[in-house]
Amino acid sequence: MALSPSVVPQESEENNANCVETKQSQTASTASEDPLQHLCLASQEVLHKAQQSGRSRCLQCGGSRMFYCYTCYVPVENVPTEQIPFVQLPLKIDIIKHPNETDGKSTAVHAKLLAPDSVNIYTYPCIPEYEGQDHEVVLVFPGPQSISIKDVSFHLQKRIESKGGDKADDLDMPPRKLVRTEAQEGWHLNESMGKGPELKRVVFIDSTWSQTNQITSDERLRELLQVELKTRKTCFWRHQKGKPDTFLSTIEAIYYFLVDYHRAVQKEEYRGQYDNLLFFYSFMYRLIKEARRSGEKAKQKPIH
C-alpha cells in the first residue's frame, strides 16, 4: 500500500523555518527532559485517537494490531493512510533484519511505513547484491574500521580511484601508457567514473546487538564501507543493558544518518525534512515515558 504524500502541509517551508528557530533556542535542560520535543512533526491526533480506541484490524492480514501491522507494513484500520506523513528521502535505505528479531519490538517498520518508496526490509540470510557497488553503498554499524559521516565522500572517492587502478592492471599495461592512450582518445578516467563520489544506498542492520555479528560478518557486506554515528545518543525505551548510549535503535540510526548526511555531505541547512521518520517513534516514546512516570507515582503513594 503506497502512503499518500497529500498529508504534507503546503506551508511546510514556513513550518520548517519555524522549526529551525525553535531548535536553535533549545536548552540543554529541556533536551534532557524530552530530546524529541522540538521535532517538526505532522499532527499526531490520529495516533491519539487510535490509542484511545485500542487495537484495530489490519486490512491485509486481518491481524489485531496497535497503530500499524508490523508484518504487512501498513497502518491498521483506525489509522487512515491519508493521515500518516509521507517522507521523501535522498537515498535508498536497505534494512537487513535478523530472523530472530521480534517484529513487534522492531522500529524498522516505521521507516517502511513513512518512506515506502525509499525503504526495503530484508530478512537475513536474504541480502541484496552489492558486489561492484561498494563505491556507492555504505553500511551503518560501529566498529574499529568505521568512519564518520563527514569522511564518507573522501573514502568513496578513494574506492573509485582504486577501481581505476584495477582497470590498468586488468589491461596489463603500464600506467603511463594507459593514460597516454586514453588522452589520445579524448577520454579521461575520472570523467568515466563521474564528477565525484555519489552515495546512493545505505544499509542498516535490525537486530539485538548480541545477534549482529552473524550479519556483519557475512561476505556480502564485508567489503562495504562502515559508518558510525559517534555523537548521537539513543532514547530508546528498550535500550540494552551494558551497551553505550550511542548504540541506536534502527529508526534513530536512519534518522540521524540522514540529518548528518544532509549537513555534513550535502552541505545544506537542515530544516526538519526527515523529522517525520520519528512520527511513530516519538509518540510511543512519550506514551511509554508517561506510563512509567505514572507507575512510579503509584509506587510512591503511601498505603493507609
Swiss-Prot record:
Membership in a protein family: Belongs to the TDD superfamily. DTWD1 family.
Organism the protein comes from: Rattus norvegicus
The entry's keywords: Nucleus, S-adenosyl-L-methionine, Transferase, tRNA processing
GO cellular component: nucleus
SMART domains, sorted: DTW
Function: Catalyzes the formation of 3-(3-amino-3-carboxypropyl)uridine (acp3U) at position 20 in the D-loop of several cytoplasmic tRNAs (acp3U(20)).
Protein name: tRNA-uridine aminocarboxypropyltransferase 1
Intervals of motif DXTW: 206-209
Lineage: Eukaryota, Metazoa, Chordata, Craniata, Vertebrata
